[in-house]
Amino acid sequence: MRRLSSILLGLLIFFVSCQKNKHEIGKPAIDQDQLLNGITTDTFDLITYTINEDSAITDNMANVLLGSYVDPKFGKVSAEFYTEFRLKSLNPVFGDVGTIVYDSCVLALQYVGYYGDLSAQNFEVYELNDSLSMDTVYYDFSTKPVKPGNLVVNGMGTITPKPLTNTVVNGDTLAPQLRIPLDTNFAKGILEESTSGNGTFASNVNFQTFFKGFKVKVNNPSQVIGKGGIFYFNINNNAASKLTIYYTQSGVKKSYDIVMNSLAADFVHIDTDQSGTPLEMVLQDSTKGQSTFYAQAFRQRAVIKIPGLDNLPKNVVIHRADLTLPVQFQNGYRYKPGSAVSVAARLKTSDTRLSNLNVVGAFVDSKKHFAIDLRTYAQALVADNIDNTGVVVSPVFFRNSAERIVFNGPNTINKMKPKLILTYTTY
């Protein structure tokens, strides 16, 4: 797996989910002398299971997702995206388009990361038959109709992604790109439109009425369990991600770019098939989550309830509340648990939405667990500021990645079990 950059982590940590409210519970100061004399207990019973996420907003995210993989625990996951294009400049001059020889047409997408392996996938591109809008909210289940016919050059859609290898274009070495070759007849139609007299290239509104954009997807019906990956591309703020028409005119090699940027609408569509998987069994019977429970970007969140926190006396000061969540992962396995998780809760039993607790649990690779500081959460429970509805844990890039996590439950057959260690004093 290739994680998103640390810079992107900083930017995205505030956008963990479209359905979380931010809530500052409060941060009582730690008195080190009291900490040394405090009472420590780790005998809390935990109730663990998995819940489904109804939907996630996916329009104009920091990166789009593309690809598929088949996970032995989660089933098949597929990601595709829809995007508009914009003119790089208005009223371009192509001269006599009748003299143009169309050499190639390439959709270039610059990688910013990936999840899974680098086996070959079959990529397809379709022209949209309906416009996108920056004013519309799009979800992971949203779709748009397309025109018939895959635009990828016949026989050239099967591509082995190389997100770790620089791309060379016309002798220039560039950051890694996925380059999808498209039918030059499509390119011809774009440039010939400049002579139509319709003013297509006079404004982006006119151009987007003529060319509404692309749906970019994969088609991997024979992908087997444990194979595949989903790739992350920056199309909103990256000049390298674009559609380029390469042509020759009067013996001179030329090119014309049509761009994607933050002013062009886009969204990601996600499909999952959990049929017959261990995840499906936990979703159907939450008690099975006591052995193993799960979290998956866009789709599922992990729940940890700690009923024993209700039994704490009201005259306690919580000094530490360390929740550790061991995961099932072996070094070298392609589907890693990610670098961090976000933590949320329903602050009142009547709440229908999650509130972000402003807590990020880091993955401790040497111990194969996530470490989560629940001190402020536990103190808020003691003070009766919130209800004990449990905490909800998700991949920190819930709307920007394909990450998934397999957690050990309290009844796991594995050695490491989830545990809350609480240190407190009374007054």
Where are these regions (language model features)?
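Secreted, disulfide-rich extracellular signaling modules
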Residues: 2-8, 12-427
